[in-house]
Amino acid sequence: MPEKAEPAEGWPVVEGDYVVGDPEAPVHVVTLGSHIEEDILKAAGEDKVAIAGPCKTENIGIEKVIANVIANPNIRFGVLCGAEVTGHLTGQCFKAMYENGVDPDSGEIIGAEGAIPYLENIPEEAVERYRDQIVELVDLIDVEDVDEIVKAIEECVEKDPGAYEEGPMTISLEEEEEEELAEVAGMPVSAETVTVEYRINDVRVGVKSIGAMQRYMAGYLSGRTMGLLIGIISGMIFLFLPMVVLGGV
C-alpha cells in the first residue's frame, strides 16, 4: 500500500467552490467551467479523489488550486476536465503552467493563451512544487462525461506512488478575489467581457502609438522643411553677398 502523509492542518487551506473527498486520495480534479464535481466524487468514490471543483480564471483560480494541492503531499495526480472557459482559456493555461512553469520576473504562465495568465500572488517556488509533486496531469479538457473522467481517475489511483517526499507546503494568497467572476470598477463581469476589455485596451494602446508616430513624423517633416528653407536662404546669401560687395566696390 502506498505510503501516506498528513496534509497541512485545516486542509484545504484556501476557501473555494469545491468538494472534498479523502485527504489521502492521490487525485485532484479540476472541472474548469463545469459544475460536475459532486457527480464525479460520487461516481469515483471519496477514497479516490482528494478534492474536486471548478476553476474559471487563469490567475487567482489556478493559484487557489496550487495552494490547496501543495498543502497535501498525498495528491500526486491532476485531472483537467469539464468545459473550457471562454476568454480565460483556463484549461489551456493550467496545462501550460504544468508543462512550462512561469516567467520568474513577471509571473506570466509560459505558453498560456488566456486573457490574463499571470500568477502574481504566489511565489515561483509554489508553482515548481506543484509541477514536481504532480507526476501526471491528465488532459480531458471539454470532457464532461463522468464515466470517462472516473476511468482516468481510477488509472491514476492504480499508479499512486505514495505521498510526495517533502511535507506540506503552505502559502497565503496575497490577494483574495472571486474565482467565478472578475471585477471591473467594482462590478462583476463575465469572462467574455474581460477579454473584450483587454482587446479594447490593446486597440487604445495601438491608436495612441499611431498618434504619437504621426506627431513625430509631422514634427520631423516640418523640421526638415524648415531646415531646407534655411539652407536655401543661407546658400543664396553666401552666393550673392560677394557679388553685391564686389559690385559696390
Swiss-Prot record:
Its EC number is 7.2.1.4. It is a single-pass membrane protein. Keywords: Cell membrane, Cobalt, Membrane, Methanogenesis, Methyltransferase, One-carbon metabolism, Transferase, Translocase, Transmembrane, Transmembrane helix. Binds 1 5-hydroxybenzimidazolylcobamide group. It catalyses: 5-methyl-5,6,7,8-tetrahydromethanopterin + coenzyme M + 2 Na(+)(in) = 5,6,7,8-tetrahydromethanopterin + methyl-coenzyme M + 2 Na(+)(out). It holds the Pfam family MtrA. GO terms for molecular function: cobalt ion binding; tetrahydromethanopterin S-methyltransferase activity. InterPro entries: MeTrfase_MtrA/MtxA, MtrA. Its main location: membrane. Residues 247-249 are extracellular. Residues 2-225 are cytoplasmic. It comes from the Archaea. It is found in: Cell membrane. The chain crosses the membrane at residues 226-246. Pathway: One-carbon metabolism; methanogenesis from CO(2); methyl-coenzyme M from 5,10-methylene-5,6,7,8-tetrahydromethanopterin: step 2/2. 5-hydroxybenzimidazolylcob(I)amide binds at H88. One of its GO terms (cellular component) is plasma membrane. One of its GO terms (biological process) is methanogenesis, from carbon dioxide. The complex is composed of 8 subunits; MtrA, MtrB, MtrC, MtrD, MtrE, MtrF, MtrG and MtrH. Belongs to the MtrA family. HAMAP family: MtrA (MF_01093). Part of a complex that catalyzes the formation of methyl-coenzyme M and tetrahydromethanopterin from coenzyme M and methyl-tetrahydromethanopterin. This is an energy-conserving, sodium-ion translocating step. This is Tetrahydromethanopterin S-methyltransferase subunit A.
